[in-house]
Amino acid sequence: MPAMDLLNYCIIVRCGPDQESQALSALEFTQALLVQGHKVERVFFYQQGVLTASSLRTPAQGELNITKLWQQLQIENKLVLDVCIAAALHNGIVDKTESERYELGAHNLASGFQLAGLGQLAGATNACDRVVTFGASQ
């Protein structure tokens, strides 16, 4: 049996953390790729997916903390977790730089995540063998 070709993937997460089954599918798919030896160029959180990157998220008792699961995966695999800056700002998610820029006095981008523009997504999709999107457009 021939060896499996290892591919370079870009994952786009458009579903919010409250859409637990879709959000968990994105995480588990990414985990499976890494276990199989594939490379994940980056994970790009877009539209409602940016809500995953809020350090202020506190899921209800019994719900998964998808933010912490992504953070753990990022640490273990040195993943790039990009968050669309326009969608993040629209949803009140800012890093220290944007907080200072807009004189907000606080920031809430969870550790392990970074703000990025659509240019990073475009570059990643050109560099990847496969692009997989989770979540319906809103």
In which residue ranges do the predicted regions lie?
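Short, charged beta->alpha transition segments
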Residues: 1-2, 69-72, 117-122
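Protein-protein interaction regions
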Residues: 6-7
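Short, glycine-rich nucleotide/cofactor-binding loops
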Residues: 10-24, 53-58
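Histidine-anchored nucleotide/phosphate-binding helix
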Residues: 22-43
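Short internal beta-strands
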Residues: 30, 41-47, 81-87
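Short, active-site-adjacent cap segments at secondary-structure transitions
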Residues: 50-53, 89-91
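A glycine-rich helix N-cap at a beta->alpha junction
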Residues: 59-90
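N-terminal glycine-rich phosphate/adenylate-binding segment common to multiple enzyme folds
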Residues: 85-138
